[in-house]
């Protein structure tokens, strides 16, 4: 495996608070933070971009780890709509720094992530509907 540099920026100097991460030679960027700093997360310009996001916490019915996986053309607008869901206490999302993700890309990524999360069976997957993976097929080389 080739070497890489992972750059983590601690917005407030605390790894448990708002942070961003970038990997060398990768066009993606990750942003994560606790629900208690939701307003600070929304102030980030990255929330205006399309991407995939994760809401994590504890399922109140089973008391087990829970995750909701979603996609949006505007991360900030979409995650605001999840404020009524009580289970989550952390948010993380991934965007493309070169703005090269289309709706089809993020729907496919969301779908694959949901499939992987369900098959791993390490958390309760809180998504109630199917994913976009089945509607976007991978092209296979002949």
Regions found by a protein language model. Give the residues of each.
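Structure-specific nucleic-acid interaction/processing domains
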Residues: 49-50, 75-142
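GIY-YIG nuclease catalytic motif and its immediate N-terminal context
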Residues: 1-69, 73-81, 100, 104, ...
């Amino acid at each position: 495996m080739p070497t890489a540099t992972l750059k983590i920026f601690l917005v407030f100097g605390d790894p448990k608070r708002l942070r961003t991460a970038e990997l060398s030679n990768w066009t993606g960027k990750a942003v994560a933070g606790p629900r208690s700093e939701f307003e600070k997360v929304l102030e980030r310009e990255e929330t205006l971009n399309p991407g995939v996001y994760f809401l994590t916490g504890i399922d109140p019915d089973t008391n087990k780890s829970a995750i909701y996986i979603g996609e949006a053309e505007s991360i900030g607008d979409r995650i605001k709509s999840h404020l009524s869901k009580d289970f989550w206490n952390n948010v993380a999302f991934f965007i493309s720094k070169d703005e090269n993700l289309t709706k089809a890309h993020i729907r496919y990524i969301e779908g694959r992530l949901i499939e992987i999360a369900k098959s791993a069976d390490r958390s309760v997957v809180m998504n109630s509907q199917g994913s976009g993976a089945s509607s976007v097929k991978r092209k296979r080389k002949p």
